[in-house]
Amino acid sequence: MTTLDSILAGRYPAKAHARRVAERLQVGGSGRNGIIYLEAQKTRLIEDNDEAMHFRQRRPFFYLSGCPLPDSSLIYNIASDKLTLFIPPIDPEDVIWSGLPMSVAEALRLYDVDQVLHTTDVNATLASIASDGNGKSVAFAIEGQITEGIKFDGFLETNTSVLKGAIDSTRVVKDEYEIALLRKANDISAKAHIAAIEASKTATNEREIEAAFLATCIANGARDQAYHPIVACGQNGATLHYGRNDDDLVDPVTKAGKSSVLIDAGAEYRTYCADITRVFPLGGRFTSETQEIYKIVLQMQLEAIAMLKENVQWEDVHAHAHRIAIKGLLKLGILRGSEDELFEKRISVAFFPHGLGHYLGMDTHDTGGNPNYADKDTMFKYLRVRGRLPAGSVITVEPGIYFCRFIIEPYLTSPETSKYIDTNVLEKYWNVGGVRIEDNVHVTQQGYENLTTAPKAIEEVEVLAT
């Protein structure tokens, strides 16, 4: 049986990715003599400082190389199916401070490429390929990602308009190796979420919970985060991308403790991301109001996940989650009216204002979702993925219900919408802040595979928090 570790012990499948991108470029006939040229991110210094900025590899380059090194480049010769990686030559002055860089032999062993040269060889290689193509080769590159001095002389055309889109579209469907990386990022993140919940038992501030999450990720091999963690206690959870993470868990004025914490955080492992959200109680038990909302959100998520399979229409899944929210809020008395009328009037958007999820991969909000932020339908405006989900895609499923005054109060002051919300009942729920539950799900031909193992059942979460 193939294990996660055995898959990841192999090389990142850069060559297969290059072939898939070339197919999407639809090069045929004489166009098969084309090349793909990509550059890594450059080493950059902090302004007015001699320290390097935090390095984040360019995703298109990594996708076709698996190489995390800065200041590198690659050429994929489509006709010969040859992938060449170019790495920086040795800089004697840099060796004094940083040690010897990766050698050509080591890079050839580590990465799924046919040849490794130095970046000083790029122009000579380009000239040779152009000559072999008799002036009929097309050079595909990305606008704004070509170093000054790189020469495409002798090529029929330098096309900088289609490669980025071809890579972005190809990235939607993940291969076995990519799924393994995403699973590993999820495994590490699950451990970190558990550590964060356990840390809350002695923490006095949001930052201590964040610190526990970060420390666990680093200790388990994920030094980078997929995005800035969100650690939001009490009403801070009503802010979707709250990021201050520095609020006291007990109000310094009233001495009242916050009831719960929403933590949205995920590790980045070898360039691939996890994106997980959990809500847990402070003090070991959810308040009755938070538990009521939690149960609705969990049902929204479980039913949405159950719908996932190849070619499912994502808008349908999102709409179903809204209907579950409406049913739950009607049962609590927060909403008034019929389910169908509330759905048609989009009243649930006041409490669930964002999309159900997004593609996940090398970016947290991964490529290929084709969102329509100009959509006038408020229920779908912020849906980051539109259309049918292909097998092999990985998508987040993250429904939520929030009690954000800024969003809800316009509904309360409008004659058209105020009649659907019972303000007397609503008053009891402001302190809930927000509840969001988020998992990362691999869509398959048969259905789905949930990559996220962090506990989310109320009983499990309360045990960890006690």
Curated annotation (Swiss-Prot):
Give the top-rank taxon of the lineage listed in the UniProt record for this protein. Eukaryota
Q: Which Gene3D superfamilies match?
A: Creatinase/methionine aminopeptidase superfamily, Creatinase/prolidase N-terminal domain
Question: Which is a Pfam family this sequence falls into?
Answer: AMP_N
- Has keyword Hydrolase? yes
Cofactor note text: Binds 2 manganese ions per subunit.
Q: Which CDD domains does the annotation name?
A: Prolidase (cd01087)
Enumerate the Gene Ontology biological process terms: proteolysis
- Keywords, A to Z? Aminopeptidase, Hydrolase, Manganese, Metal-binding, Metalloprotease, Protease
* Regions that span the bilayer: none
What's its top-level EC category?
hydrolase
List, alphabetically, the InterPro entries matched. Aminopep_P_N, Creatin/AminoP/Spt16_N, Creatinase/aminopeptidase-like, Pept_M24, X-Pro_dipept-like
Q: What is its EC number?
A: 3.4.11.9
Keyword flag Manganese = yes
Q: Where does Mn(2+) 1 bind?
A: D275, E398, E438
Catalyzed reactions: Release of any N-terminal amino acid, including proline, that is linked to proline, even from a dipeptide or tripeptide
For activity, the cofactor(s) needed are: Mn(2+)
UniProt binding sites for Mn(2+) 2? D264, D275, E438
> Which is one GO molecular function term here?
manganese ion binding
| Function in brief | Catalyzes the removal of a penultimate prolyl residue from the N-termini of peptides.
Q: Which family does it belong to?
A: Belongs to the peptidase M24B family.
Name-wise, this protein is: Probable Xaa-Pro aminopeptidase pepP
